[in-house]
């Protein structure tokens, strides 16, 4: 069996990269922050790729809706990262590493949604 279609999508690949970077980032937090904001940010980042993947096996209209949900999850992830930054849980170097991934993913998500006719 070959790779599922979603694994070949550049937008999915970038979403996976972001989710893995956030996972590594949260691992250094104390238990309280891992259990609260950490879980939220990991789940929201993981859901970006999950929605992209789920959409690839749906009809176009449902795929569009799932990609919109993925974009909403990206916004939730950005919100959580802003909170983490304000709470001094993220260093400047970590932020500099994650920001380009977010920028690329945002652009790719919007382009992917547009390519689906939305």
Task: Explain the meaning of each model-derived region.
Residues 1-118:
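Amphipathic alpha-helical assembly/interaction segments
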């Amino acid at each position: 069996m070959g790779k599922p279609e979603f694994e070949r999508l550049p937008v999915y690949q970038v979403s996976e990269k972001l989710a893995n970077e956030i996972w590594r980032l949260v691992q250094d937090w104390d238990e309280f922050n891992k259990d609260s904001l950490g879980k939220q940010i990991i789940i929201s980042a993981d859901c970006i790729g999950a929605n992209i993947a789920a959409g690839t096996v749906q009809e176009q209209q449902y795929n569009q809706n799932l990609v919109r949900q993925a974009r909403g999850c990206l916004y939730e992830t950005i919100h959580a990262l802003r909170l983490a930054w304000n709470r001094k849980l993220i260093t400047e170097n970590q932020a500099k590493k994650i920001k380009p991934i977010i920028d690329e993913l945002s652009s790719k998500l919007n382009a992917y949604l547009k390519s689906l006719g939305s």
